[in-house]
Swiss-Prot record:
PROSITE patterns: FN3 (PS50853), HEMATOPO_REC_L_F1 (PS01352). On growth hormone (GH) binding, forms homodimers and binds JAK2 via a box 1-containing domain. PANTHER family: CYTOKINE RECEPTOR (PTHR23037), INTERLEUKIN 5 RECEPTOR SUBUNIT ALPHA (PTHR23037:SF46). GO terms for biological process: endocytosis; growth hormone receptor signaling pathway via JAK-STAT. Residues 1-18 form the signal peptide. Disulfide bonds join C56-C66, C101-C112, C126-C140. Glycans are attached at N46, N115, N156, N161, N200. Residues 289-638 are cytoplasmic. The chain crosses the membrane at residues 265-288. It comes from Oryctolagus cuniculus (Rabbit). A motif (Box 1 motif) lies at residues 297-305. The gene is GHR. Changing I346L: No effect on GHR-mediated GH internalization. This is Growth hormone receptor. Changing S341 to L/T: Slightly impaired GHR-mediated GH internalization.
Length: 638
């Protein structure tokens, strides 16, 4: 009879789905399975027809029960054919035999209940089902693994507060733990999970698990009705127990008017439109200021900007035209150093006494080994603290008349006088040995050597031919050559390009004087240390005693007091006057200027000399009450 009812139910369910024209859904199949289970409960749980364990649970960790499905054999039950046996897998009881279920009734049909006497925690259990003596299913577990508490009881809620708008409210939900769980003594620790939803909704909203028996629920609408349920689990387990009964929450209406939906400000749309507007403004600004922004980010490469020059000439590589334009302008001057004659100098170093052994000055200066190239360029750049001789504003006559730059050197004065005396003697010897009266002045090619005073300058040496025909006023008398020094010293170069020569010393008595006493001057000069400001009496007496003109032997030597260490001004003045009278020979010729200035440079080896005024006479020696200084001694000594 039951089989016919089952077949009829399945036929009715299939016919209803066929007539409705819709496909079978899981809900329809579920309703059909429920109908089948109501007609025959054992058919849906175990299709194989053999008994099988469904679950084992412990509600409070003190007792547990196991359930299984009953086997069906041709639709008839076999009473007492299914049995449950268990064994505790303890080392002490491992040798024991399987024991049968202690209680088949307390937990319901097809179940076995184990009370606290048969329950042991932390000890594994193994159970098995037998049907007519044969094992059909087996399972092993421990009690703490199968804990599933009973549902909480006594659910209720309390209104906490209502929003100012009268739309939302907050409630507090409370419940009681399962009555059979010993929670207060701490035998079992439970966690609770609350779920709620609106009555018409299908999706439950879950809250986080809590250990307390109360939890607040926020933002519930006053015009809605809610369902609330709670379930629990052991803290160390993941399996929840059954849900509690559903609690319905109906919030009171606080306003007589119907609650309207909350006005939600469209922040998202405002942000989107704001970003879009800012982007548009940025693009407009960039396009409007495109050139300026380009200049700031990528500045243009500067082009050559020279006044009066076309940049196309530089691009096309026409450098000759560019140089021509630059040469025309005042601010540009081509650096043709080889043609710049006023920076050329000639130097003769006569201060080194060691060079005397190498031959005469004439041989050394006229030899080709001492000639240097005209391409050597230099310029004096000296800041020694002394008065500079390079003063373009000073006239040539001032240089000839003044002795500031070439006669005030206290250290180099004796050496310069010695060199001039040697050169004078050499000049007179050459005049006697060479036919000056027979040879025309044009055939003479003297070498003009220019020397500095104290400090070296970058100079250019070379042979310069003197064109004497351009100066007939100076060389008209051949006898005047004896009174002209062979060498000249350049002291300055005027801005016009002329060379200014320093005034030299007058010729001395004659060839006999130079031949007889060449060593006297050197002896006097070597006896004095020119670095001292004053001089010893013995040295001065020796120098004055052997002074030139030895033929005047009857003159009276100056008397010096042996007790005085220094020479007084009065004694030296007297000696200078007596020696000066002996030097003045009645047959001496009229002195002529030793040096002159260069008027024109015709060629690298030709000079045109200017006539210069006679040098001023030596300054008088001013006697004073004191000792003799270096400058005064140089005036007195020959």
């Amino acid at each position: 009879m039951d089989l016919w009812q089952l077949l009829l139910t399945v036929a009715l369910a299939g016919s209803s789905d066929a007539f409705s024209g819709s496909e079978a859904t899981p809900a329809t199949l579920g309703r059909a399975s429920e109908s089948v289970q109501r007609v025959h409960p054992g058919l849906g749980t175990n299709s194989s027809g053999k008994p099988k364990f469904t679950k084992c649970r412990s509600p409070e960790l003190e007792t547990f029960s196991c359930h299984w499905t009953d086997g069906v054999h041709h639709g008839l039950k076999s009473p007492g054919s299914v049995q449950l046996f268990y064994i505790r897998r303890n080392t002490q009881e491992w040798t024991q035999e399987w024991k049968e279920c202690p209680d088949y009734v307390s937990a319901g049909e097809n179940s076995c209940y184990f009370n606290s006497s048969y329950t042991s925690i932390w000890i594994p259990y193994c159970i098995k089902l037998t049907n007519n003596g044969g094992m059909v299913d087996q399972k092993c577990f421990s009690v703490e693994e199968i804990v599933q508490p009973d549902p909480p009881i006594g659910l209720n809620w309390t209104l906490l507060n209502v929003s100012l708008t009268g739309i939302h409210a907050d409630i507090q939900v409370r419940w009681e733990p399962p009555p059979n769980a010993d929670v207060q003594k701490g035998w079992i620790v439970l966690e609770y999970e609350l779920q709620y939803k609106e009555v018409n909704e299908t999706q439950w909203k879950m809250m986080d698990p809590v250990l307390s028996t109360s939890v607040p629920v926020y933002s519930l609408r006053l015009d809605k009705e809610y369902e609330v349920r709670v379930r629990s689990r052991q803290r160390s387990s993941e399996k929840y127990g059954e849900f509690s009964e559903v609690l319905y929450v109906t919030l009171p209406q606080m306003s007589p008017f119907t609650c309207e939906e909350d006005f939600r400000f469209p922040w998202f749309l405002i942000i989107i439109f704001g970003i879009f507007g800012l982007t548009v403004m940025l693009f407009v600004f960039i396009f409007s200021k495109q050139q300026r922004i380009k200049m700031l980010i990528l500045p243009p490469v500067p082009v050559p900007k020279i006044k009066g020059i076309d940049p196309d000439l530089l691009k096309e590589g026409k450098l000759e035209e560019v140089n021509t334009i630059l040469a025309i302008q005042d601010s540009y001057k081509p650096e043709f150093y080889n043609d710049d004659s006023w920076v050329e100098f000639i130097e003769l170093d006569i201060d080194d006494p060691d060079e005397k052994t190498e031959g005469s000055d004439t041989d050394r200066l006229l030899s080709n080994s001492h000639q240097k190239s005209l391409s050597v360029l230099a310029a004096k750049d000296d800041d020694s603290g002394r008065t500079s001789c390079y003063e373009p504003d000073i006239l040539e006559n001032d240089f000839n008349a003044s002795d500031g730059c070439d006669g005030n050197s206290e250290v180099a004065q004796p050496q310069r006088l010695k060199g001039e005396a040697d050169l004078l003697c050499l000049d007179q010897k050459n005049q006697n040995n060479s036919p000056y009266h027979d040879v025309s002045p044009a055939a003479q090619q003297p070498e003009v050597v220019l020397a500095e005073e104290d400090k070296p300058r970058p100079l250019l040496t070379g042979e310069i031919e003197s064109t004497l025909q351009a100066a007939p006023s100076q060389l008209s008398n051949p006898n005047s050559l004896a009174n002209i020094d062979f060498y000249a010293q350049v002291s300055d170069i005027t801005p016009a390009g002329s060379v200014v020569l320093s005034p030299g010393q007058k010729n001395k008595a004659g060839n006999s004087q130079c031949d007889a006493h060449p060593e006297v001057v050197s002896l006097c000069q070597t006896n004095f240390i020119m670095d001292n400001a004053y001089f010893c009496e013995a040295d001065a007496k020796k120098c004055i005693a052997v002074a030139p003109h030895v033929d005047v032997e009857s003159r009276v030597e100056p008397s010096f007091n042996q007790e005085d260490i220094y020479i007084t001004t009065e004694s030296l003045t007297t000696t200078a006057e007596r020696s000066g009278t002996a030097e003045d020979a009645p047959g001496s010729e009229m002195p002529v200027p030793d040096y002159t200035s260069i008027h024109l440079v015709q060629s690298p080896q030709g000079l045109v000399l200017n006539a210069a005024t006679l040098p001023l006479p030596d300054k008088e020696f001013l006697s004073s009450c004191g000792y003799v200084s270096t400058d005064q001694l140089n005036k007195i000594l020959p």
